[in-house]
Amino acid sequence: MHKTSPHRNQRLADQIQRDLAELIPRELRSSSLGLITLQSIELTPDLAHAKVFFTVLGAEPEHALKALQEKAGYLYSLLFKRLHIHTVPTLHFHYDSSVEHGIEMSKLIDQAVESDQKDENK
């Protein structure tokens, strides 16, 4: 198994993220998919697989995930033409719910602060 340096691994992940961010809106033209934003790319040390974490605005995450999974092979072939490397990682899409969790936590904190302020004013 061939391993790459962490620096090269990160540069490649960044390049894949930039390329996919350009390709996805162009190749998956569907208003029902909403706005897909790529959060991060995690590559395996041997560069065989890439976990692509995304969020979506204005559509159901499950619908966007299904569409991305269906087009993963096509996006892979487009990346292969762009990257000019021997092995392009297989793409595995994952919905990143951390943004939603962050918003929920922020709302809970706001509610707790508001409740404390009401208690102090009594």
Curated annotation (Swiss-Prot):
The keyword Cytoplasm applies. It is found in: Cytoplasm. SUPFAM superfamilies: Ribosome-binding factor A, RbfA. Keywords: Cytoplasm, Ribosome biogenesis. InterPro entries: KH_dom-like_a/b (IPR015946), RbfA (IPR000238), RbfA_dom_sf (IPR023799). One of its GO terms (molecular function) is ribosomal small subunit binding. Monomer. Binds 30S ribosomal subunits, but not 50S ribosomal subunits or 70S ribosomes. GO terms for biological process: maturation of SSU-rRNA. One of several proteins that assist in the late maturation steps of the functional core of the 30S ribosomal subunit. Associates with free 30S ribosomal subunits (but not with 30S subunits that are part of 70S ribosomes or polysomes). Required for efficient processing of 16S rRNA. May interact with the 5'-terminal helix region of 16S rRNA. The keyword Metal-binding does not apply. This is Ribosome-binding factor A. It comes from the Bacteria. It comes from Polynucleobacter necessarius subsp. necessarius (strain STIR1).
